[in-house]
């Protein structure tokens, strides 16, 4: 239930009173995170808010998207509601089993960064832009964001997910 991004959620995951936005990059230079709206990093309604960046690299030894989907399905196998929710979210995200043979690229996780979005985090929000600015997309370089990356498990604990 927490994966709400494919259902037009403002952020990818909502857990407890907080949320988690996940960005992926293939870039070897910097750690770019493309932000899709003014609301995406606005923590005024849900706290805590975390931004996770996953650096992937394309490699023959990596995992394909259909393999990752199969792994996720294995995790929820035997639980009717999670199976239904995962299938619903995958379709909403544009993943269809009939197209699995088209996903030939393989990726490995090279690095992950998880940062808590707080007052000093560089971001644009509806309350921080001039009157009249109603939409914006922008990019943040996570290599240049002040503050430490925290372990994923720590963020999930703070969100009440584990």
Where are the model-predicted features located?
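Nucleic-acid endonuclease domains
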Residues: 1-9, 25-162
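Conserved catalytic cores of phosphodiester-cleaving nucleases, focusing on short active-site segments
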Residues: 13-26
